[in-house]
Amino acid sequence: MSASAESTNATPYGTLPPTAAASARKPISLPRLLEMHARGEKLTMLTAYDATFAAVADAAGVECILVGDSLGMVCQGLSSTMGVTLQAMCYHIESVARGLRRAQATAWLIGDLPYGSYHESREQALRSAAALMQAGSHMVKLEGGGWTADTVRFLVERGIPVCAHLGLTPQTVHALGGYRVQGKTQESAALMKRQAHELQDAGAALLVLEMVPAALAAELTRELTHCATIGIGAGKDTAGQVLVLHDMLGINLGKMPKFVRNFMTGAPGVKEAMQAYVAAVKNGSFPDNTQHAW
C-alpha cells in the first residue's frame, strides 16, 4: 500500500476521510463524538456481544459499540428482547469490555438497560445503570419517550451518560402493535418531536431513532442542537447509523429488515465487511433512502 493510501485509511470497499482515520486512532469520548457530529462527520455504531467481534469492530474503525438487548434474539434464541435480564447484559458487557481492553481499543461502549430494569423508579434505574457501568459501559441506553426524561436527568446528574431511543422501541413492541414504522401521522410525528426535545433537555447526548420516516428523522437531526441522532431504518440524514452485527453480516435465518445491507457480500472477511460499513456511512452511500428507509 502506498503512503498516500495509508494516510487516508483506504479499504478495499472505500476510503475513510482523514478525519475518520484520525478518530479511529484516538480514544473516543462523548465530547469527541459530539465534536465529530458538530463538524459534520457521520458517526458509526454496531452491536457486539463478545470480546472478539467487539475488538474486530474497533479495528475496523467503528466508533461506538452497543451491547444491545438484541442479544436476547441473536444470542439467546428469545423471540423478543423482553426476556433479557440485567445479569445477562452485565455478562456480555464485561466480555466486550475485556476484549476492547485487550485490543487496546478506542471505541465508545454503550450498554442497553433491559426491560424492567428502569421502569419502577429513578432509584431502580440508577442501580441498574451503575451495574452496567461497573461491568464496563461508558454510557447506558434506555427506550421510551417523555416518561423517561426524569430518569435521564437523574442519571446524567449523577455522571452517567445516557443514550435515548425513540421510534420503534422493541421493549414495547406489543403495545406498538408489532415492528412498524413510527411517526407516520402528523400527530405521532409531533409527539416524537416533543419527546426528543424533552430527552435532549434532560441531558441525553445520543438519541437512537428506529424505523422513523426519513423526513422526520432529518428534521429532528436539524432541530436537536446538543444531542446526536443515530438512525436505524431512519434514513441517511441522521448524525450516525447503527446496525445489529448479525444483520449486517447476513447472519439472519428470517426475513432481512428493509433497512439492512449485507456488507459481507463481496467481502473477504468480517473486518473488511465492517470497514465497508464504516466507509459507506461516512461517505453517505448507506443508507440509501430509496431502498433502506420510509
UniProtKB/Swiss-Prot annotation:
Pfam families associated with the record: Pantoate_transf
Binding site for Mg(2+): D69, D112, E143
Polar residues: bias regions: 1-12
Pathway the protein acts in: Cofactor biosynthesis; (R)-pantothenate biosynthesis; (R)-pantoate from 3-methyl-2-oxobutanoate: step 1/2
Gene Ontology biological process terms, A to Z: pantothenate biosynthetic process
Swiss-Prot/TrEMBL catalytic activity: 3-methyl-2-oxobutanoate + (6R)-5,10-methylene-5,6,7,8-tetrahydrofolate + H2O = 2-dehydropantoate + (6S)-5,6,7,8-tetrahydrofolate
Subcellular localization, as worded in the UniProt entry: Cytoplasm
EC number of this enzyme: 2.1.2.11
Keywords: Cytoplasm, Magnesium, Metal-binding, Pantothenate biosynthesis, Transferase
Domain of life according to the entry: Bacteria
Positions annotated as active site in the UniProt record: E210 (proton acceptor)
Keyword Cytoplasm attached: yes
The record's free-text note on cofactor binding: Binds 1 Mg(2+) ion per subunit.
InterPro entries (alphabetical): Pantoate_hydroxy_MeTrfase, Pyrv/PenolPyrv_kinase-like_dom, Pyrv_kinase-like_dom_sf
Residues annotated for 3-methyl-2-oxobutanoate binding in this entry: D69, S70, D112, K141
UniProt function note: Catalyzes the reversible reaction in which hydroxymethyl group from 5,10-methylenetetrahydrofolate is transferred onto alpha-ketoisovalerate to form ketopantoate.
HAMAP family to which the protein is assigned, alphabetical: PanB (MF_00156)
PANTHER family associated with the record: 3-METHYL-2-OXOBUTANOATE HYDROXYMETHYLTRANSFERASE
Family stated for the protein in its record: Belongs to the PanB family.
Quaternary structure note: Homodecamer; pentamer of dimers.
The protein's name in its UniProt record: 3-methyl-2-oxobutanoate hydroxymethyltransferase
Natural source organism: Albidiferax ferrireducens (strain ATCC BAA-621 / DSM 15236 / T118) (Rhodoferax ferrireducens)
Gene behind the chain: panB
